[in-house]
Each structure stands twice: as C-alpha cells, then as structure tokens.
Amino acid sequence: MEEEKLERSIRKSEIPGLTREEEEAQLAKVIGIAEQNLEQAKADIRLANEDLADLMETYDAKEAEGLALWNNATAKLNAYQHGMARLEKARKKPYFGRIDFQDPRLSFLESYYIGRVGISDEKAEPVVLDWRAPISSVYYENSTGPCSYTVSSEGTFSIDLKRKRTYEIENDHLKDFFDSDVVANDELLTKYLAKNKKAVLGEIIATIQQEQNLIIRRSPKTNLIVQGVAGSGKTTVAMHRISYILYNYEEDFRPEDFYIIGSNRILLNYITSVLPELDVYGIRQMTMEQLFIRLLYEDWDEEKYMVHTCLLYTSDAAD
C-alpha cells in the first residue's frame, strides 16, 4: 500500500512554492477542490435519500429482506452525511501544516499538507492528509533532519525532513505561516489560547505536542495508563486517541468497542459533544456508578468476579 502511494506521488510534477503568493494560490486551489467534493457529497446524499424512500415504499419493515435493505441504505446515508460534515469542517480551514521531505527510495522532494480531515482531488490523489495518517506523525514528532514514521503492518520508513511549516488560516484566508525554525508548536498553542481562552478543537489538533502525539499513536494492542494533574489535557488526548485508533485500525475496532467512563454526566456530555468534531460517532459512555451496577447485575460472572471474605482480628494490645 505504501509503495503504491509512493508510485502515485512520482507522477506529481509540481511541489508547492514557498512565498506568500504561492501559498495563497495553493490555498485557493485546495478550497476549490474541497468545494467540489462538498457538492458531490450533497448529490450523494440526495440520491441516498431517494433510494431509502423507494425502499420504504416497496418493502415492509417486518420483512427480513426489507429490513436488511433498509438498514444498509440507512448506514450508507449516515456515512454520506458524516462525510459531508467532515468536508464542511475542512472548507474554511483545510489544513494547518505542511511537511517537505526526501524519501531515499525516490529521487525528488515530496510535499504534503496536513489538516483535520483528508482531501483528495477528482483523481483520488491526496491534496491534504488527515492528521491521523501515519506520515502525519512526522509533523508532530520531529524537527528537520533524518526521521522516520511507521505504518501498521508495513514497517518503518526513514525520510529526511526538509521543512515543517505551520499555517494560520481563518475563513478562507491565509493570515500567516511559520517554519519550524521560527516558531514551535507550543508557541503557536500559546498564541491560539491568547486569542481565545477556550481554543476550539481544530486548533488543538494543530498544536498537539510531541509527548501527546506519542500517547495518541501508541498501539491499541497494549494497555495504556496516562496520569496527570487536573487540566493537563488527559481527556483531550484520550479523545484524539479514540479518533486515531478508529481511523488506523478500522478492521480491528468499531465505535461500539469503546466505553468512556466518567465521574459525572457533565463531563460525559462534554465528551459526547466534542467527539463528532474528531469524526467519532457512536461511542458509549457511563458513570462509575453505572459501571458498578452493570458489573454487579448485568455482567456478573462468578468465576471472573470472585468475592473473598476474611475475618479481621485485633489483639488485646491494639484494644
């Protein structure tokens, strides 16, 4: 798969420029592609709605065949709607970063923009990479120079990072951009927070720190415990980790495989409202009290949850 991507990139004859004028032209180009994709998504949703309406007129929901067709059509419609939601988010701020690098397997420089969601042109060539893509980790973890990224089940690839650029884009307009030797991610985060004390999630994605990124991208096949003081970003990292796992391990994990356990409903409601911003839907949640009730009354397994009684003795001296 990775080799196929590299072969496709060989056909790219143009690398985006470095000046402000060239960057503004590139932004306009990407926004144009995003708008085309958005119009196509709207057309797909209209057709999916028509197909669902036809099925409802043709089949009775009580029929096994009809119910199966209804469910498939509904799932297809939901997928289109989620896709359109992603495109709408990318429309006014399609990307926040860029990496230029040399792959030793190729004889030319490669360049990729990184955003909250991936954007592809009509030929299915990526013009913006999703922040959860394996190679996007280079943007978060490395300074310029030799580095590497890992693709699950394919191995680790070494590259030479030539440039890491961060963009400040608002409502279709390029306000500013910085190279890694001018401003670091933590400085950019400080700038965002100074502008808006309650930074929106899209800006947080752009300013994920190296240590946070390592936690987010760690393999889900092993247990992971993250400790930190209140307000240190544990919940934010956990939400991004769920999004990353569902994106990169879709054959192994589904949304219903996750449970978010919180101390109160206020926290859980906040998490539920934020997860769709990370392209995550259908995650189940419960409070600690609900968890204990479920363990005691719904999922109780005498062999798994054994209660051992014991007697405590106190000596006369202790009395």
Describe the role of every protein-language-model region:
Residues 235:
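Walker A/P-loop
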Residues 1-205, 209, 213-214:
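Extended, charged low-complexity regulatory segments
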Residues 226:
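Hydrophobic anchor at the beta1->P-loop junction of P-loop NTPases
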Residues 230:
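The conserved Walker
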Residues 238-243:
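Motif I (Walker A/P-loop) of helicase-class P-loop NTPases
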Residues 215-221:
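Phosphate-binding P-loop
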